[in-house]
């Protein structure tokens, strides 16, 4: 009997992982089905929704990402943030466990940074973002998210929190990636906001 709670937790975690994997596959398939020209239009709409709506002071460090596969292209949004004084950075994958955020400068060339991504090279300054634009597979209206399965962002956020930092997390997705309910566990890291082509939604934690 003493083992039952432990076994129940293991079963619940297994079911949760299976559900997340199914949702991830389904929502990414929907994202992949968006025609390229439509994806561009939706990405530009995101820049319009959030370009001025996100409050930050000049010098604030904001991490974005260079789009791969069928991700939204947030480069227009990042350009708007830069014009307002943000310091931009993008992730570089060091290994299967670790990403760092390298400063993105217009004058710096981009190089391959792992898993099909591109960004500044090793000579770039490594920054700790205060606002993070986070790609994802699926999300719900509570701010719970499903990533790509590698856990890179979760570990990066964990390292920032160990430093005493609490970056604001803004999920980047298309409307088709929303689900009714993401199975969540106590250790999961939730979003503070979500940006889609329909608009920008802030959760209470953005202000808190």
Question: Language model features by range: what are they?
Answer:
Residues 67-70, 137-141:
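Short glycine-rich anion-binding loops that position phosphate/pyrophosphate groups of nucleotides
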Residues 6-128:
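N-terminal active-site beta-alpha-beta segment that forms phosphate/nucleotide-binding
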Residues 2-18, 22, 32-33, 123-132, ...:
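Surface-exposed, charge/polar-rich loops and edge strands
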């Amino acid at each position: 009997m003493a083992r039952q709670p432990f076994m129940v937790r293991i079963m619940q975690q297994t079911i949760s992982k299976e559900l997340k994997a199914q949702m991830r596959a389904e929502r990414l398939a929907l994202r992949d089905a968006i025609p390229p020209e439509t994806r561009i239009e939706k990405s530009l709409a995101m820049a319009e929704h959030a370009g001025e709506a996100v409050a930050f002071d000049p010098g604030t460090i904001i991490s974005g990402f260079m789009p791969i596969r069928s991700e939204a292209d947030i480069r227009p949004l990042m350009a708007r943030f830069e014009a307002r004084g943000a310091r931009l950075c993008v992730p570089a994958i060091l290994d299967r466990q670790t990403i760092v955020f390298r400063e993105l400068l217009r004058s710096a060339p981009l190089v391959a940074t792992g898993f099909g991504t591109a960004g500044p090279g090793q000579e770039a300054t490594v920054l700790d973002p205060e606002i993070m634009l986070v790609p994802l597979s699926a999300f719900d209206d509570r701010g719970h998210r499903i990533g790509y399965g590698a856990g890179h962002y979760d570990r990066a956020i964990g390292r920032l929190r160990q430093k005493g930092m609490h970056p604001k997390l803004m999920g980047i997705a298309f409307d088709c990636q929303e689900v009714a309910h993401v199975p969540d566990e106590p250790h999961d890291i939730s979003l503070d906001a979500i940006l889609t082509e329909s608009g920008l939604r802030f959760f209470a934690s953005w202000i808190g």
